[in-house]
């Protein structure tokens, strides 16, 4: 299995690329994004400039690289920092990542629980979606669940027991995921 789900500090990961949950207005004022801003000020300036130029959109993560070899995937989980995250934007962004990670040269990646915490989404919905979609990638992936997530919600049986639902409510375990990856 190429996906490991755990709790802990994303910044302790040995993955080549770290995923930063952002909004589209150039603010990294809370949560994990604020820590990214502190640790990577050049990345923050690049992100803020892209937001001013209206180049950051939900469902469309982008890769930031610097001369030191830092790989950060800025993953917009919502339009405005005051807004709630939408599961559709998480799904679309994961599919976009799956289509682009090879082109970006990413060999491994560590993801936070996208849209949870300040985004307002629940791990019970986000976790299975992330696990099932990111399992399509051919690289090692770490997913960091929210602190305090019960151990059983980090396991394969929990993450695969219920297929995430498409907007029309249809669900066909593994097959649905393959169709989403291939057609989106």
Where are these regions (language model features)?
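Macrodomain-like recognition of ADP-ribose-binding/processing modules
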Residues: 1-184
């Amino acid at each position: 299995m190429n996906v490991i789900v755990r709790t802990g500090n994303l910044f302790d990961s040995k993955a080549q690329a770290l995923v930063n949950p952002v909004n589209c207005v150039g603010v990294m004022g809370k949560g994990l994004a604020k820590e990214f801003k502190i640790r990577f000020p050049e990345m923050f300036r690049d992100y803020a400039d892209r937001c001013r130029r209206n180049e950051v959109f939900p469902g469309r993560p982008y890769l930031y690289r610097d001369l030191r070899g830092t790989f950060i995937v800025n993953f917009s989980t919502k339009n405005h920092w005051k807004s709630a995250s939408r599961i559709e934007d998480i799904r679309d962004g994961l599919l976009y990542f799956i289509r682009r990670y090879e082109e970006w040269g990413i060999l491994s990646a560590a993801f936070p629980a996208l849209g949870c915490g300040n985004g307002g989404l629940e791990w019970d919905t986000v976790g299975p979606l992330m696990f099932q979609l990111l399992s399509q990638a051919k690289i090692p992936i770490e997913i960091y669940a929210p602190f305090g997530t019960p151990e059983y919600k980090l396991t394969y049986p929990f993450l695969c027991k219920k297929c995430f639902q498409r907007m029309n409510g249809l669900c066909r375990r593994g097959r649905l995921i393959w169709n989403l990856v291939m057609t989106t």
